[in-house]
Amino acid sequence: MIINSLKRFGITTGAAASAAAKAAVIGLLNKEKRSTVVIPTPIGLRLEIPVEKVEIDSEISCAEVKKFSGDNPDILDGLVIRCCAKLNENNEIVIIGERGVGKVTRSGLKATMGEMAISPTVREMIINAIREVTDKGIQITIEVPNGETIAEKTLNKMVGIVGGISILGTTGIETPVSDDDYLEHIRCELNVIRQSYDYVVIAPGNSAAKYAAELFDSNCIIKVGDRIGDSIKLASNLFKKVILAGLPAKLLKVYAGIFNTHYSQGDARLESLTHASVLAGLPYGTLTKISNALSVEEAFTYMTKEQRRKVMNIVAEKILSRIKSFNDNINFCVIIFDYDGESLSRVGC
């Protein structure tokens, strides 16, 4: 089978910030203006990323990198991420978010409430990139010149991030998973897996795939992005067993019958979580907090681990009943992970 078109991968805002930080440190210490830098990523790949501009002063150096989204429809494509570096008195690397970087105003997100929206994974990426240049103490300031304006066109405010964009990315790489042509890629990958396995694990994203790899052979796991329903339909015609493994936010959309989980196709995450929580018999006070939360992650902070398990079991059972309608002759399984990777529910396995 031939894929008719090759899709371009992109880089995350976190990878852009890491590249800008490394270029700024090279400028600061070596007085050198690099046109590209190579950075390490959490998945072991190294990325060579173009640097748009480097400005060097006696005590500070700044570099700019443009976010590149590949063939993903992304409003952040082309956005400039600017990092400035100066020496720190101790040997630590301090990372500060300023103009255009959002601030976290609600609990449950990857960054702590009150901090700037720079994920722990990105902070580690930046530190690793800088440590390839020096072991000296460095202060990095991240700015996104047009971040506050662009953020108004994103969902950041709805989840409790205000004043700018988030600096995110679990792998550093942005995969083109949201367009129609990506289905052909999924079909090809399923056919490859079929040659060696009679089952397949459908994982919407990087974290789901990572957690699933602790339970299954990584070679039988396929990342499908938003196209969950289409991928399950394709897989149900090829395998004896199809396992859907994901995190709560994505799978709560499937619970509501939204099988393409791209934001443009609808959103019922908190409504679904509230509904399942009612069915699970959670206390009224907890239900109120859940329904008023801005994100699933925040809502989870109001629930005990046992309550999460009870609610997610209801969600998994409903999802299982939905996907069984695709093919009655297939053994389907649904696994829902907590945000720390622990399995909250496992139905049909």
Swiss-Prot record:
Listed Pfam families: CbiD
GO BP of this protein: anaerobic cobalamin biosynthetic process; methylation
Top-level taxon in the UniProt lineage: Archaea
Catalysed reactions, semicolon-separated: Co-precorrin-5B + S-adenosyl-L-methionine = Co-precorrin-6A + S-adenosyl-L-homocysteine
Enzyme class: transferase
GO MF annotation list: cobalt-precorrin-5B C1-methyltransferase activity
EC number: 2.1.1.195
Annotated Gene3D superfamilies: CbiD-like (3.30.2110.10), CbiD-like domains (3.40.50.10720)
Pathway where it operates: Cofactor biosynthesis; adenosylcobalamin biosynthesis; cob(II)yrinate a,c-diamide from sirohydrochlorin (anaerobic route): step 6/10
Alphabetized UniProt keyword annotations: Cobalamin biosynthesis, Methyltransferase, S-adenosyl-L-methionine, Transferase
Plastid recorded as keyword: no
InterPro entries: CbiD, CbiD_sf
Keyword check for Nucleus: no
Family statement: Belongs to the CbiD family.
Record-given protein name: Cobalt-precorrin-5B C(1)-methyltransferase
Species name: Saccharolobus solfataricus (strain ATCC 35092 / DSM 1617 / JCM 11322 / P2)
